[in-house]
């Protein structure tokens, strides 16, 4: 049986993007700068060249890169909202179409090994080009069309020359610049970092410390890992925690339709079928690997700055951290036979749950938001 047409299209544009950035390593002016002293709580990281970051930042905020000039990267990854979109469960794409997935934060994305929640991109360079070509996101017909548009804009000539010593754009340069800007979005040095790695005893209050103890006691650190000298709060693996099965069950009955930011209405599934709206399940990692074991499995997100990056889960189905804690405490979705065995009911009273939420709040970096405009 052939994959659905939409899945075949997604695989095709992902492959095209990957081909365009092949061979970036060691590409002269694309090379990154020196290794920086790591931010407290994070591993070492090569610092991108400043001119490359500046060009990437300009591209990131530029709506002219979309097919109809209405969308930019920053419209789904809003700096003042933790580089996600707090008002939307899932992103809104070209012509107002509601996408399947919540926009993940870009904070500390330099340390993410496999990009997108299904892990379909191995590098930031490969990831950066995909939204430009996705038919429901920025909807450009080809990278050539994007490059021609950039070359027609006089305000790009100086930034391009500063980054690459030439005034014209290339596919590799476009990918490298966007990736460089994303690599610059580092946010660590949280209260937890100061307490755990910096040994500042008073950096956390007693409730936050109790929340951390519960976090360890109940095995949350198995997936949201803490290493000896740093903590990415992810195992970079893919798990089915039951969320998609729960969402699918709700989809059989009704759908929340976005009317405006923060305003939704519930519409019966039968009514949507009448007007031809496509019914789209999300199979997660399976859409990349086609392995049955990967159905409804999604990449473990980092918990850094999680208090800033709601709504939560790959589909934005939980609006608060308290709701997320309640979901885990209840054992996820027990009716899903493929749910990860590590998801089980937890004995947590109201004070325990509040302490866990307080601990998660202690993971917020003081530099988690950056200026909105280039």
Feature-to-residue mapping (PLM):
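Short glycine/threonine-rich turn/loop motifs
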Residues: 28-130, 193-318, 323-326, 333-336, ...
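Post-cleavage N-terminal segment of exported redox proteins
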Residues: 1-53, 59, 112, 130, ...
């Amino acid at each position: 049986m052939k994959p659905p047409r939409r899945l075949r299209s997604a695989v095709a544009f992902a492959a095209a993007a990957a081909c365009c950035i092949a061979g970036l390593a060691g590409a002269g002016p694309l090379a990154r700068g020196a290794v920086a002293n790591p931010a407290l709580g994070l591993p070492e990281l090569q610092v991108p060249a400043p001119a490359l970051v500046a060009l990437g930042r300009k591209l990131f905020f530029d709506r002219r890169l979309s097919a109809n000039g209405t969308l930019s990267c920053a419209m789904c990854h809003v700096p003042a909202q933790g580089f996600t979109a707090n008002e939307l469960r899932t992103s809104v794409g070209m012509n107002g179409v509601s996408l399947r997935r919540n926009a993940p934060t870009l904070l500390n994305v330099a340390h993410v090994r496999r990009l997108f929640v299904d892990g379909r991109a191995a590098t930031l360079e490969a990831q950066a080009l995909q939204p430009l070509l996705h038919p429901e996101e920025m909807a450009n017909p080809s990278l050539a069309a994007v490059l021609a548009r950039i070359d027609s804009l006089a305000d790009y000539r100086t930034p391009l020359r500063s980054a690459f010593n030439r005034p014209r754009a290339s596919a590799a340069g476009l990918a490298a610049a966007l990736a460089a800007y994303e690599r610059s979005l580092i946010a660590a040095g949280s209260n937890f970092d100061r307490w755990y790695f910096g040994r500042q005893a008073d950096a956390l209050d007693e409730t936050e410390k109790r929340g951390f103890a519960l976090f360890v006691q109940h095995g949350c650190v198995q997936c949201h890992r803490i290493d000896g000298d740093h903590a990415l709060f992810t195992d970079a693996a893919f798990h089915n925690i039951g969320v998609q099965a729960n969402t699918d069950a709700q989809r059989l009955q009704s759908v929340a339709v976005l009317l405006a930011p923060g305003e939704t209405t519930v519409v019966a599934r039968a009514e949507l079928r009448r007007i031809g709206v496509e019914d789209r399940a999300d199979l997660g990692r399976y859409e990349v690997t086609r392995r049955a074991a990967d159905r409804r499995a999604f990449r473990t997100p980092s918990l850094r700055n999680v208090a800033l990056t709601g709504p939560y889960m790959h589909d934005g189905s939980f609006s608060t951290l308290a709701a997320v804690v309640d979901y885990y405490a209840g054992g996820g979705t027990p009716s899903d036979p493929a749910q990860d065995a590590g998801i089980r009911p937890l004995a947590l009273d109201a004070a325990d749950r509040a302490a866990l939420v307080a601990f998660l709040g202690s993971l917020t970096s003081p530099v988690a938001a950056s200026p909105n405009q280039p």
